[in-house]
Amino acid sequence: MSNYPKYRVAAVQASPVLLDLDATIDKTCRLVDEAAANGAKVIAFPEAFIPGYPWWIWLGNADYGMKYYIQLYKNSVEIPSLAVQKLSSAGTNKVYFCVSVTEKDGGSLYLTQLWFDPNGDLIGKHRKLKATNAEKTIWGDGDGSMMPVFETEFGNLGGLQCWEHFLPLNVAAMASMNEQVHVASWPIGMPQEGHLFGPEQCVTATKYYAISNQVFCLLSSQIWTEEQRDKICETEEQRNFMKVGHGFSKIIAPNGMEIGNKLAHDEEGITYADIDLEQIIPGKFLIDSAGHYSTPGFLSLSFDRTEKKPIKHIGESAQETVTYEEIQYGNKANVKVHS
């Protein structure tokens, strides 16, 4: 792009209304309104914000979690739906925003970032390519057809979710599309010291992403609340695991430095920063891993962006409805039933 705008970005740190689609959609719209009123042009939301992250997968076995999975399934986002209509209305604040949802497509669930533009259009989505560990009991896989970067008046916008930032091939694929502003959607930072899901580890991965791909990262995370604990914790051990707070939202510049206002780990709020896309250029001079600093002669990545469907339908079904009247009174010779 020939234009390198300066503008304000925002990263949300908040708790959803766990397993309540309508209430969390309403909260999402209020947060978009708030960020837009404070001048943000691009707004990031945490991983699995609508209708909340399935924390029970880390708290107990499948029998314990099934009742919550059923609630999640019934409160997931379908496209199209009234939920998407409401989110689209929030886009009329003349902002871009990216919100991570549990999407229901057919009979399966997927972890999906939805992108809305200033007209309220749903311009695309990114499904998490591979659910992490116990998440595989909830969400199916994405593919390369849903790994977009959008060319906009505010630069090239893209996003990944949680541990997707730890995978070098994901990072390289995003670099190949010349992303400039990145939404890094995370759940919370596990409070247990040394945990691989801890805030230090997640922030380190996001800072590496910012430096490696020369992008501004809008890191957005949830927080744990007493309401969430009351919703799904059935034992004292579970409550002790799910401690209140542990958000770590922040905005990271292409040099890995944190910019903007800071939020306490147990504080709901929005962190803002004023960014200048021209600051990306020095990094491109030094690195550009998908360009002059690459070594395609012996190291390269094949990035397949075609849609991968588990079942391919060939031809069209010939099924027709034969009415009661046709069955009872019609010419039997003309009545055909297709199996």
Curated annotation (Swiss-Prot):
Keywords annotated in UniProt: Hydrolase
Family: Belongs to the carbon-nitrogen hydrolase superfamily. Nitrilase family.
Enzyme Commission no: 3.5.5.1
The protein's enzyme class: hydrolase
Active-site residues, Swiss-Prot/TrEMBL: 47, 128, 162
CN hydrolase domain sequence ranges: 7-277
One Pfam assignment: CN_hydrolase
PANTHER family linked to this entry: CN HYDROLASE DOMAIN-CONTAINING PROTEIN, NITRILASE
InterPro entries for this protein: C-N_Hydrolase, C-N_Hydrolase_sf, Nitrilase/CN_hydratase_CS, Nitrilases_CHs
Name of the coding gene: nit
Organism for this UniProt entry: Bacillus sp. (strain OxB-1)
Name of protein: Nitrilase
Catalytic activity: a nitrile + 2 H2O = a carboxylate + NH4(+)
Gene Ontology terms for molecular function: nitrilase activity
Top-level taxon of origin: Bacteria
